[in-house]
């Protein structure tokens, strides 16, 4: 084999190697693009689920807060009614309530 033939074979082999490397790089980019697409779909799906979860949690929070506040108010009102069964307590409570309400009304 001549030197020229060896050079041609070497160049051919080198070009084949370059072609394989380019194909490998292209395949790697294709795989990376698919992976990014999968990750993007996953994140979007999780974000959509979180929006639904937050909406339900906020609804439940609101209901529980209303219930708890209503119970506290009912207990407080019952205590006031029990306290005011005694006429002296009723009069003292009424006077204090009116006085404190006036202080707040005057400060507005």
UniProtKB/Swiss-Prot annotation:
It comes from the Viruses. The lineage of its organism: Viruses, Duplodnaviria, Heunggongvirae, Uroviricota, Caudoviricetes. This is Uncharacterized protein Gp1.
């Amino acid at each position: 084999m001549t030197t020229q033939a060896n050079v041609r074979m070497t160049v051919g082999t080198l070009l084949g190697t370059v072609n394989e490397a380019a194909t490998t790089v292209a395949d790697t980019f294709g795989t990376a693009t698919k992976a990014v697409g999968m990750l993007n779909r996953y994140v979007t799906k999780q974000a959509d689920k979180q929006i639904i979860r937050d909406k339900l949690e906020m609804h439940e929070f609101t209901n529980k807060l209303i219930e708890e506040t209503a119970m506290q108010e009912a207990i407080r009102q019952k205590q006031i009614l029990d306290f005011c069964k005694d006429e002296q307590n009723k009069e003292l409570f009424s006077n204090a309530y009116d006085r404190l309400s006036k202080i707040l009304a005057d400060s507005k």
